[in-house]
């Protein structure tokens, strides 16, 4: 029994010890900063540490357009090691898994989860090493601050997915503590509940500072890695919907740099995946980046009234929407779209076009040393070939009401963008519209020809009708492993949790309406028992024994009447 005197003694001793610890900590922090002869010396010292960090194996293939000093100057006076983020530990775990699997040509494949239940079942699968959280799933099932669920248009509050990450990560930690306690008592090996989380950051939800805030949130909430796609804020769509608007290559590159810069300031090692939707994208927000010019489409008729002008005129005249829709189809039917080089091929002779291609290759390889030409440069080159021939090409006339350009989404566009993004990211994600192994193989080999260490990501999307693409059972089973051999190390079924949740509950509900508890027992309890699903004893699954153990410590063992997992009321002894 603890007396009041002992309490006072304990409190005096504890208070004194804590005071010494605080003062000691405060002095060490002041020494770390004030011990240097000046702020500049402190910055120089910390910058050297950052440079050494960047030289580690973790960042051997990462480029940065800024210096270590830029990072340190934006950290403040507290040394970076005063803040420790668990997500950075998880990121190192993820990095090592990726390195190992990329080296071996094996997949790091996983399923998207939508709640702690699914996370816990995923964790029990030894050969699934990571977890995934989808923005689509969050948008349609869990928008915490507004509860406005909707399709995946990226228009939910930007803390939506980070908050789901926090929810899943905290659940991982609870189940890890529960499993660790059990293993410490039984001497067994605990389940690894701390699978690194990879999360959907959409398009970053804004400009550079917004992207930095989003990246910071993900690191604080527990995500080991995130992916960012090259779509426009306000024009984002699910990668398997039409109408997505791409941003210029430079804009997305800025997002990747902003993300890395934020994590460098925090001193974390989280991973960023650069996703490109340019394989299927049909719209581009701006023509500002010359690297995109080769893929912008225009018309080859002269003196055509631009579609946007015709549209405004019709709207002013109150023409019905249905008539406007018909006119739009007619306008684009009459004005076929071409890239500049397709336009040249139409207007040049075969020999002229061949001469143009030879001159272009020579200019890019031998003189400019880059893989692209701007529209201005392509026009000048065309004039060199045929000085007297007028080349008609107008990429402004077909622009949409919002001002978007027509874009020729194709595998070549995806390759070009990916080669730009790769040095500033940890992985490259190719978003596709079909599960096509040959397309993936072609993409991989062209990327690896120039950047052999680039790890790739593949979305094994539920949006594909997998049964309609000619797979037999053998090919379907080997698809993941065949992709991994081509460097697609990370593979995920993004909405697996959502679909499995829907179909299992639909089967139960559909039967329950007529069969009552017979349906529940057959479709749930029997299946839980047959498959060794630990949700069957949901009280134990939720951590009731762990909490009882806490109570025993706090109450000095005098808790036999208040424990939740003993006594007649504890019904899980029936199983």
From Swiss-Prot:
Transmembrane regions: none
Induction pattern: Repressed by glucose and induced by ethanol and threonine.
Pathway: Organic acid metabolism; propanoate degradation
The protein's role, per its UniProt record: Catalyzes the formation of pyruvate and succinate from 2-methylisocitrate during the metabolism of endogenous propionyl-CoA. Does not act on isocitrate.
InterPro entries assigned: ICL/PEPM (IPR039556), Isocitrate_lyase (IPR006254), Isocitrate_lyase_ph_CS (IPR018523), Pyrv/PenolPyrv_kinase-like_dom (IPR015813), Pyrv_kinase-like_dom_sf (IPR040442)
UniProtKB keywords: Lyase, Mitochondrion
Enzyme Commission number(s) from the entry: 4.1.3.30
Keyword Glycoprotein set for record: no
Species per Swiss-Prot/TrEMBL record: Saccharomyces cerevisiae (strain ATCC 204508 / S288c)
UniProt subcellular location: Mitochondrion matrix
Name of this chain's protein: Mitochondrial 2-methylisocitrate lyase ICL2
């Amino acid at each position: 029994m603890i007396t009041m005197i002992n309490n006072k003694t304990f409190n005096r001793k504890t208070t004194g010890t804590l005071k010494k610890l605080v003062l000691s900590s405060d002095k060490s922090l002041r020494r770390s900063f004030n011990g240097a002869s000046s702020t500049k010396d402190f910055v120089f010292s910390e910058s050297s540490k950052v440079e050494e960090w960047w030289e580690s194996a973790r960042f051997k293939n990462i480029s940065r357009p800024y210096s270590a000093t830029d990072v340190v100057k934006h950290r403040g006076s507290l040394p970076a090691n005063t803040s420790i983020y668990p997500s950075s530990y998880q990121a190192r775990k993820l990095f090592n898994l990726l390195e190992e699997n990329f080296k071996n040509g094996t997949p790091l494949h996983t399923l998207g989860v939508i709640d702690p239940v699914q996370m816990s079942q995923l964790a029990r699968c030894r050969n699934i090493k990571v977890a995934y959280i989808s923005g689509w799933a969050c948008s349609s099932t869990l928008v915490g601050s507004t509860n406005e669920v909707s399709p995946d248009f990226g228009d939910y509050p930007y803390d939506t997915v980070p908050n789901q990450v926090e929810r899943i990560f905290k659940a991982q930690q609870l189940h890890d503590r529960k499993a660790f306690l059990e293993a410490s008592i039984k001497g067994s090996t605990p389940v690894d509940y701390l699978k690194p989380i990879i999360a959907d950051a959409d398009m970053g939800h804004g400009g550079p500072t917004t992207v930095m805030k989003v990246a910071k949130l993900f690191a604080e909430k527990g995500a080991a890695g995130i992916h960012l796609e090259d779509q426009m804020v306000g024009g984002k769509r699910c990668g398997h919907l039409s109408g997505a608007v791409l941003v210029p290559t430079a804009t997305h590159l800025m997002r990747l740099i902003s993300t890395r810069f934020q994590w460098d300031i925090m001193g974390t090692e989280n991973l960023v995946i650069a996703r490109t939707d340019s394989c299927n994208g049909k719209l581009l927000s701006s023509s500002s980046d010359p690297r995109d010019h080769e893929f912008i489409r225009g018309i080859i008729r002269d003196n055509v009234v631009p579609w946007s002008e015709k549209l405004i005129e019709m709207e002013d005249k109150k023409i019905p929407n249905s008539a406007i829709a018909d006119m739009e189809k007619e306008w684009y039917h009459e004005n076929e779209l071409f890239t500049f080089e397709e336009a040249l091929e139409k207007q040049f002779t075969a020999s002229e076009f061949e001469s143009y291609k030879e001159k272009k290759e020579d200019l890019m390889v031998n003189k400019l040393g880059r893989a692209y030409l701007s529209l201005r440069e392509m026009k000048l080159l065309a004039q060199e070939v045929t000085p007297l021939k007028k080349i008609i090409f107008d990429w402004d006339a077909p622009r949409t009401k919002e001002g978007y350009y027509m874009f020729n989404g194709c595998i070549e566009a995806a390759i070009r963008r990916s080669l730009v993004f790769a040095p500033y990211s940890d992985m490259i994600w190719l978003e596709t519209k079909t599960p096509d192994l040959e397309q993936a193989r072609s993409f991989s080999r062209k990327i690896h020809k120039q950047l052999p260490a680039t790890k790739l990501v593949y979305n094994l999307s539920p949006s594909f009708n997998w049964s309609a693409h000619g797979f037999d059972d053998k090919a379907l089973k080997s698809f993941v492993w065949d992709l991994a051999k081509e460097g697609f190390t990370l593979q995920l079924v993004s909405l697996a949790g959502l679909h499995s949740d829907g179909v299992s509950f639909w089967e139960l509900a559909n039967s329950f309406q007529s069969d009552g508890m017979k349906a529940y027992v057959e479709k749930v309890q029997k299946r839980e028992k047959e498959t060794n699903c630990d949700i069957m004893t949901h009280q134990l699954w939720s951590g009731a024994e762990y909490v009882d153990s806490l109570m025993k410590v706090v109450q000095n063992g005098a808790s036999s009447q208040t424990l939740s997992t003993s006594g007649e009321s504890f019904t899980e002894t029936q199983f």
